[in-house]
């Protein structure tokens, strides 16, 4: 590492140390915010997963009940009238991390809310509601799992950058500043000694006169 022992270089190096420390503080704050967001989503998704098994069992029970009460033919007929669903992918930004958001929409079909209220038996209606709710919850869990994955990648990246600044860049700059200061001090001492010697010679010359 080439060191230029000048006062300007010392000022620049000290300025770089200050900026590096400021950047390190910002990275640590960012990492703390990302970890907080990660833990919040983890708690939410844990609760959603715990409820998911019960929701699956409830949905299967309602479809069995509907089949017993209305028959398989009626179920299949209404199932064929159901609309396709579309998942739209959007995103939100959390401390510079792009988090995908998934929005579920149902396309228009014969099986409208009005038609269901008038023509679809209650047991089948209940089964439709349960499965739509279950599907929506699955989409939300998938969205949050993607968010956790992206946050984890960014947390790791931020940690590596922080470590590089804290353990490599700042110590290197501090060593550089220390060496420049030592070299400047040494130069000043040499200059002072030289001037002192010159002064003595001048004074000695005067005495000889």
UniProtKB/Swiss-Prot annotation:
GO terms for cellular component: plasma membrane. InterPro entries: V_ATPase_D. It is a peripheral membrane protein. Gene3D superfamilies: 1.10.287.3240. Pfam families: ATP-synt_D. Transmembrane segments: none annotated. One of its GO terms (biological process) is proton motive force-driven plasma membrane ATP synthesis. It is found in: Cell membrane. Keywords: ATP synthesis, Cell membrane, Hydrogen ion transport, Ion transport, Membrane, Transport. The keyword Transferase does not apply. The keyword Cell membrane applies. Signal peptide: none annotated. Belongs to the V-ATPase D subunit family. PANTHER family: V-TYPE ATP SYNTHASE SUBUNIT D. Has multiple subunits with at least A(3), B(3), C, D, E, F, H, I and proteolipid K(x). This is A-type ATP synthase subunit D. It comes from Thermoplasma volcanium (strain ATCC 51530 / DSM 4299 / JCM 9571 / NBRC 15438 / GSS1). The gene is atpD.
